Amino acid sequence: MPVIWLIDAYRAGERGQVRALADALGWPCETKTLRYRKHVVLPHVLGRTTLRGIDAASAASLQAPWPDLVISSGVRNEPVCRWIREQSGGQARYVHVGRPWASLDSFDLVITTPQYRVPEEPNVVNNTLTLHSITPERLAQARREWAPTFQALPQPRIAVIAGGDSGPFTFGAGAAARLGREAS
């Protein structure tokens, strides 16, 4: 059985995609939650291989035996994942989910979506949609759970799935209310 580390992403959408991939693999995984140092930007921007962006306790949690596979997302985690792969003597494979910030040869595999315009390369999988944990069983459970709430609403019904904040774009209560009005 392979040893898999999930380097927990710091944003909910990224975290969900990492966990969805882990769930799909069906193997046990160990989640490593990192705390980031404030005002440390250069390792991420410059594509370095370092632990400089995380605090000492987080760095101390990353020790041998090294994993066979590291799955992560987010620019802050990239230098750390490269460091893990380097410490393993190159044995740990690094899968990055979402937008890659470093050069593509920094990753063993990138699983991304079209909005990031990642070039086609042998180590890039470009999915139509983001990874998720929605299964037929979860949909059936939600249907049973929510049927009484929606039963009285007029048909046809339209569902809108919207993400959260992304960089300078925020999705607060006002934006959600406006989306609801405009979708009705």
Each predicted region: which residue ranges?
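A conserved nucleotide-sugar
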Residues: S184
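Extreme N-terminal starter segment of soluble prokaryotic enzymes
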Residues: M1-W5
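A nucleotide-sugar donor-handling region in carbohydrate enzymes
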Residues: D105-G174
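Active-site and donor-binding regions of nucleotide-sugar-utilizing enzymes
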Residues: L6-I7, R11-H132
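Charged/polar, solvent-exposed surface patches and flexible loops
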Residues: A20, W83, Q141-P148, R181
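Charged helix-capping and loop-helix junction motifs
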Residues: A173-R181
